[in-house]
Amino acid sequence: MEELEPELRRRVERAPVARLATVRPDGHPHVVPITFALDAGTVVTAIDHKPKTTTSLQRLRNVEARPVASVLVDHYDEDWSRLWWVRGDGSARVVTGGAEREQAVERLVAKYEQYREAPPQGPVIVVSVARWAAWSP
């Protein structure tokens, strides 16, 4: 597992949203925006109370069938000298209970004020990042 440079880590930790990419059964990518928390070499996201079109979410099925994922965090600015992105690629798993899930939810609650009122009740996806890639001008 690679470590993320301190400045890039700070940027990722402050970002409010990331994109989670998983692989559909037909091999095509599936990308969704997520709330997330970073801890050492893992990125966690949870299925929360925000309205969903179904309870059988594609991202969960994808991870269970093919346990790989990428998480992309980026920043856009009209001043292109301030653009940047960081991507973590790794293995992924769905966690439905136990201490690992509770710790992930605690990290999300600490980051997002909205979760203090309604902590995520659904499964957690844990991405163990094996490789970080980044770009900035």
Predicted stretch roles:
Residues 14, 66-68:
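Short coil-to-beta transition motif at edge beta-strands of beta-rich domains
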Residues 13-15, 28-29, 85, 118-120:
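Short solvent-exposed loop/turn micro-motifs enriched in small/polar/acidic residues
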Residues 9, 57-60:
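Short amphipathic alpha-helical segments and helix-helix/interface helices
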Residues 2-3, 76-137:
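Charged, gly/pro-rich active-site loop segments
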Residues 2, 53-57:
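Short, conserved loop/turn and helix-capping segments at secondary-structure boundaries
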Residues 1-19:
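Short, basic/aromatic recognition patches
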Residues 16-52, 71-73:
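Short beta-strand segments
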